[in-house]
């Protein structure tokens, strides 16, 4: 089982007496891009926050194993030290920090060459952005790209990308997918969370989520077909059809 980086076993999470995640099972292999596909409200982001260890997303049942270590109740800071990072769907602004400082936060020590490489990877000229401040003068698309650049610069073991294609103006989907492939080629395992089935063309494997649970894990094309033919048209019938 050395090739398995992340394993989720029977994970359930309640909010106000209602399950937002129910009996989730998932296996992600080291070095792969694993796509999690589902409609808005399927539980994808909740699963991402649970894996990251966010305060309000500690599971009621089940386990999260990272490199076969049980991290279910490990604080978010400890998970970050293990090499897990999350690119939020709504990027954190960190008002007042220079972009170069923000990109160096996950590094043992600031590395100018790596920061410049990360900015170039997301099509932001280093000369124009290195010394800019992370503030409201940046557009939503710029903040999203800076968030992705921060993950790229960290070179984590596991990068959880929550809807990385949303809110991006100048960076096309193909550019984003190319960046994700570069992350994986550099040794980072990627969990790609999306509601766009076309984003899965870069994935090595995939899972389909609906109503807070993983309904299917396996071949990318089969996941895309289920999503296109059933989930978009009849989300309430999908669970019964599988």
Regions found by a protein language model. Name each.
Residues 58, 70-85:
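ABC ATPase NBD coupling module
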Residues 163-164:
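Walker B catalytic motif
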């Amino acid at each position: 089982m050395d090739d398995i980086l992340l394993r989720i076993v029977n994970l359930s999470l309640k909010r106000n007496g209602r399950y937002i995640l129910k009996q989730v099972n998932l296996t992600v292999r080291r070095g792969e891009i694993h796509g999690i596909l589902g409609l808005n409200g399927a539980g994808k982001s909740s699963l991402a926050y649970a894996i990251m260890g966010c305060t309000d997303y500690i599971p009621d049942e089940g386990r999260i194993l990272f490199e076969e270590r049980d991290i279910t109740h490990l604080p978010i800071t400890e998970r970050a030290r293990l090499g897990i990072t999350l690119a939020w769907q709504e990027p954190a602004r960190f008002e007042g920090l220079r972009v170069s400082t923000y990109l160096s936060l996950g590094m043992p020590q600031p590395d100018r060459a790596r920061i410049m490489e990360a900015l170039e990877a997301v099509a932001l000229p280093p000369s124009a952005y290195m010394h800019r401040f992370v503030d409201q003068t940046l557009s939503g698309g710029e903040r999203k790209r800076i968030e992705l650049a921060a993950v790229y610069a960290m070179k984590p073991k596991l990068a959880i990308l929550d809807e990385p294609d949303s809110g991006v103006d100048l960076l096309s989907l193909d550019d984003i997918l190319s960046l994700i492939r570069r992350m994986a080629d550099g040794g980072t395992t990627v969990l790609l969370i999306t509601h766009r089935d076309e984003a899965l063309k870069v994935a090595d494997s995939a899972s389909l989520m609906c109503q807070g649970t993983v309904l299917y894990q396996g071949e990318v094309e089969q996941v895309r077909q289920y999503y296109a033919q059933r989930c978009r048209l009849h989300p309430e019938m999908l669970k019964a059809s599988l």
